[in-house]
Amino acid sequence: VNLALAYGAKAIQYFPLIQPIHFAYEEGGTYDFENRNGLIGADGNLTRWYYYAKRANEQVKAVDEYLMKSENDGIIVHGAAATKAIITNGESGEEIISSGEYKQLKKVTGDDCIVGCFNYKGGTALYVVNYNRKEKANVSLSFGCDDYRYTVIQRGKSCDVVGGRIPLTLDYGEGALVVLK
C-alpha cells in the first residue's frame, strides 16, 4: 500500500474481503482459515491480513487530504537493495529522480527507502517508504534551510516539526508523509 502511495496511486483495493472456502482447503482434508487469502476467513473470523489492512487504512485516511490534492513528480530511490531492484534490475523510467534532490529536499541518508515526490498545491510533500520488508529503517531527509516547518504524518498521527533535517524510523514497509509548510 505504501509503495503504491509513493508512486502516486489514488486508490487501493483489497481482494478478497472474505476468503472463499476453497482457498482455505489444504491437502489431507484440513482447512487453514488464518493464513490464506481474505481479510475475513471462510470461518467468519478476522485473519492476520485484516490487521495489516486496518493499519494501512489508518495511514491512508490520515494522508488522504494531502495526497489526493497532489501531483506525483516522481520517486527518489535510495540504498543498494532498492537501487538494484528498481533501477538496475527493473525498468526505470522518467519517474526516477536520479539526482536524489527534489525542490527543498537536498539529501536522503540512511537505510533503503523510496521517496515519493509530490507537488502539493505548489508546495512540497514527500512520502517516504521503508524498502525493507523484514527490518526497521532509519532514514533522514536533509533540506536546504534550518528553519523549515513540516507536518509529519506517520502511523495515522500528525505532528509539526521545525528544522533542516528530519530523522524517521520506519517499520518494515511503513510510510510517512512529510509536508513542507
Which residues make up each language-model segment?
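Solvent-exposed beta-hairpin/edge-strand motifs
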Residues: 142-157
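Conserved active-site loop/cleft motifs that coordinate metal ions or position small ligands
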Residues: 12-16, 127-129, 151-153, 178-179
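C-terminal beta-strand-rich structural cap/linker in extracellular carbohydrate-active enzymes
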Residues: 162-181
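Conserved, mostly hydrophobic/aromatic
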Residues: 4, 53, 126
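Aromatic-rich peripheral "rim/lid" segments of glycoside hydrolase catalytic domains that contact
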Residues: 20-81
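Carbohydrate-binding surface patches
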Residues: 81-146, 173
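Flexible loop/turn segments at secondary-structure boundaries
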Residues: 20-23, 134-136, 160
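Catalytic-core region of carbohydrate-active enzymes that cleave or remodel glycosidic bonds
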Residues: 1-21
